[in-house]
Amino acid sequence: MYGRSGLDRFKKSQTSEPFSVSANPPPVVQQHLSPEALSGQKTQIGAGQSNWHPPDWAIEPRAGVYSLEVVKDGQILDRIHLDRRRHIFGRQHQTCDFVLDHQSVSRQHAAVVPHKNGSIFVIDLGSAHGTFVANERLTKDTPVELEVGQSLRFAASTRIYLLRKNSEALFSRPPPPAEIKLPPPPDASDEEAVVAYNTLLNRYGLSNGESGGMLGKRKEKTGSEAGVAKRMKKVRVSFRDQLGGELAEIVGMSDGADVETEPGPINVKEGSLVGKYESLVRVTLIPKGKVKEEKAFTGGTRGGVTDRLQEAMNMLKRGPKTGIYDDLYGGDSLAKAVGTSWASVSQPAAETECGGVGEEDDNDDLFGD
């Protein structure tokens, strides 16, 4: 029925225990990839001839600070250093900077761009299967910050890119050259040369003792001069007279000395600088205390006096009025309009014996004393 070969397989299946679990299972063997296998799984470098331009805020960062750690199945495969102004990831070798060999990755998939504020941003370039930052899919042409330690994935690729930052590279000093050619020590009297020489030593991280025996001998001879130069270096503000010069004379107030009060430079002919410094000079008079007003006002208009008040003051200065109601009806204007008026004062026709008394009555006030 089974045949010879089929019977042998049937007997073997009865004797074997394919689903049995032993008490001591064999240890799991971890596979370690050889360097040759790892080199085959490293990210390929493309030609980088894409026409895509990064935003204006993109900069070229300092080398060695940021990098992408390529991880697959818990094993680090590669490390991509982010030291360019743009890093385009995709499947096309000619246009991309880093080539991803996966069928779900677009030709120009995404770009990693350093920001001028020191952070890293990821921009999706319209990929078909998406770009993911911390398992969140990005919107097309929308920059999203990739923080340190977050994951970056492209489409259905199983590779995970983790952002790493090397803070020591930000403040690391460049290694000093193997041989340093220093000029001979300058003369101590030349202060500018001494400062330039000390600046050169500080640039290479050297002290005066390490720069050579000749400099050490010079330091022993001119120890006091070096102390003076050090104190002068600490002074932030220096005046011309401290360096052997002369200060320019400034016209102004002095302690009882007679000085000129006219503004302007010294030893310059009057009128030669007209129009150059005229706008810089302004004279303001500030009176001390209250100034008594003049009792007599002669001509002109005082400040704060209206035209109507000025007209009333001018009418008072014309002398005595011809009528007792001239102030109310405009004085002469009413008399010219109606001729002789009852408001005008008529002269007496003839003098009587009581003429003296009449003159006194006319001179008296209307309402009496």
From Swiss-Prot:
GO terms for molecular function: protein phosphatase inhibitor activity. It holds the Pfam family FHA. The keyword Ribosomal protein does not apply. InterPro entries: Cell_Proc_Reg/RNA_Proc, FHA_dom, SMAD_FHA_dom_sf. It comes from the Eukaryota. Residues 1-26, 345-369 are annotated as: Disordered. Residues 1-11 have a biased composition (Basic and acidic residues). Residues 87-138 form the FHA domain. Keywords: Protein phosphatase inhibitor. Residues 358-369 have a biased composition (Acidic residues). Residues 13-23 have a biased composition (Polar residues). CDD domains: FHA_PPP1R8 (cd22674). Inhibitor of protein-phosphatase 1 (PP1). Binds to and inhibits PP1 activity. Interacts with human protein phosphatase PPP1C. This is Protein phosphatase 1 regulatory inhibitor subunit PPP1R8 homolog. It comes from Arabidopsis thaliana (Mouse-ear cress). The lineage of its organism: Eukaryota, Viridiplantae, Streptophyta, Embryophyta, Tracheophyta.
